[in-house]
């Protein structure tokens, strides 16, 4: 694919970017020296309690996606395509094209049963040798094992693939997101049918795999009428982190990245898997990147801890909290604050976060900070300490020095977190772009359309030319 010549017209695409707490539809505008985003629609996303467990309000989510796309087309009639990225691991089950039930939320408690049943059949060490995936209790293969309705399904689609199907009628599994399921062979990068059979997971429901940049299909007539244009849907790096890493302006192999939102995904890019006892014990994962590289990374709890704490305080106060003011007060806290294990399993569920963090602090021998500013600072320093530990592990396990950390996503706006990460890692942090995920989504679409150059290095060079990161130097 060739890039647009100098002086070429700016092109436009629509990016659907879905996170665990909110979703957005954005217009991306791309040219030789242009890479811009315009927010068209933002809407909440989250779990709902049902008699069957914790599920996503998927009908509302999809309706908001369609409305957002229609609004984008009205605002920018020259939009040429649609790309969709979302969080990993969760899925919908179809039978004869109909969604059997709203998708389960990855924090639903049924996953613990799935873990026990999977590991009883295939030990984790054997799983890791086949899929290279870190242990997370909500990985898709554990969810499939715990889901009684897989036997009724003819197709299982991860969230971005499910939305693409509802828009186009085309069923496919985008490869970067498929690599997070635990059912993709880390060597062949295809479905591990033997593993699925060993786990009692119906392999017939696993759809054909496509690579990022594939044109999945055009909108169905009904969707084209609702959205207002007959557009193709292009498979991007549909795992949001895969899209984010496309837009990390790394220029050398000694750079690491942190994609920070609800989660912090900390890692480096490598060409071949590192399937050692050390990487397994460090819980490092191998997820596929947009152009076939491996995102060698570790999941760290991110801003979830702070956002859940603020949510609890707002419920207690009956009023919104001024987050910038809270962060300013946190940055002004004088003296050390206690640092706790941000990845403590007791902090993974929603609700009562300040109480549960206080319990973790006491259990780890710390006094609970006095006042909300100090409490928030303790949370931020604990997240930064977890980031720094993961950076050190990435360097040791990959065998390469880390001289720069690129921190992208919503966390790049948190100056306290960026500085604390630099301080605790001893490595300079370059913060931004904040919208790396949507930018990566847009870039892959644009490349398929022939609007930008074809290599990952050239795509990142465009990010560098159009977005200036903020540098945080480690303090002694």
Task: Go through each PLM region and give its residues.
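Short glycine-rich phosphate-binding loop at a beta-alpha junction
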Residues: 78-86, 155-156, 208, 397-409
């Amino acid at each position: 694919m060739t890039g647009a010549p100098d002086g070429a017209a700016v092109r436009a695409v629509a990016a659907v970017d879905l996170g665990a707490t909110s979703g957005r539809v954005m217009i991306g505008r791309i040219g030789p020296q242009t890479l811009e985003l315009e927010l068209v629609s933002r809407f909440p996303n989250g779990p709902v309690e049902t008699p069957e467990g914790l599920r996503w309000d998927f009908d509302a989510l999809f309706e908001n996606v369609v409305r957002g796309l229609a609004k984008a087309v009205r605002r920018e009639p020259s939009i040429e395509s649609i790309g969709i990225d979302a969080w990993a691991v969760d899925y919908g089950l179809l039978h004869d094209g109909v969604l059997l039930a709203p998708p389960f939320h990855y924090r639903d408690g049924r996953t613990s049963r799935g873990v026990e049943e999977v590991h009883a059949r295939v030990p984790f060490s054997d799983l890791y040798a086949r899929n290279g995936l870190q242990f997370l209790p909500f990985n898709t293969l554990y969810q499939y094992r715990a889901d009684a309705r897989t036997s009724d399904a003819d197709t299982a689609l991860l969230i971005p693939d499910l939305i693409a199907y509802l828009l186009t009628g085309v069923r496919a599994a985008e490869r970067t997101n498929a690599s997070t399921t635990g059912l993709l062979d880390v060597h062949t990068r295809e479905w591990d049918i033997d593993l699925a059979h060993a786990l009692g997971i119906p392999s017939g429901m696993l759809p054909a795999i496509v690579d990022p940049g594939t044109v999945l299909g055009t909108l169905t007539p009904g969707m084209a009428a609702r959205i207002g244009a007959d557009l193709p849907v292009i498979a991007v790096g549909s795992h949001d982190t895969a899209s984010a890493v496309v837009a990390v302006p790394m220029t050398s192999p000694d750079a690491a990245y942190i994609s920070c939102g609800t989660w912090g995904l900390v890692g480096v890019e490598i060409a071949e898997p590192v399937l050692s006892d050390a990487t397994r014990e460090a819980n490092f994962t191998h997820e596929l990147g947009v152009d076939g590289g491996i995102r060698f990374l570790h999941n760290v709890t991110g801003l979830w801890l702070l956002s859940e704490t603020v949510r609890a305080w707002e419920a207690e106060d009956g009023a919104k909290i001024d987050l910038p003011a809270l962060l300013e007060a946190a940055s002004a806290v004088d003296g050390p604050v206690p640092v706790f294990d941000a990845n403590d399993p007791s902090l993974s569920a929603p609700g009562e976060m300040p109480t549960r963090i206080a319990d973790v602090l006491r259990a780890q021998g710390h006094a609970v900070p006095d006042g909300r500013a100090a409490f928030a600072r303790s949370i931020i320093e604990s997240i930064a300490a977890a980031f720094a530990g993961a950076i050190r592990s990435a360097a040791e396990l990959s065998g390469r020095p880390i001289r720069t950390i690129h921190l992208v996503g919503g966390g790049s706006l948190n100056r306290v977190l960026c500085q604390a990460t630099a301080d605790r890692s001893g490595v300079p942090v370059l913060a931004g772009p904040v919208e790396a995920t949507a930018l990566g989504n847009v870039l892959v679409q644009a490349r398929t359309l022939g609007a930008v150059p074809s290599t990952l290095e050239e795509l990142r060079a465009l990010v560098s030319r159009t977005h200036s990161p903020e540098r945080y130097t480690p303090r002694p």
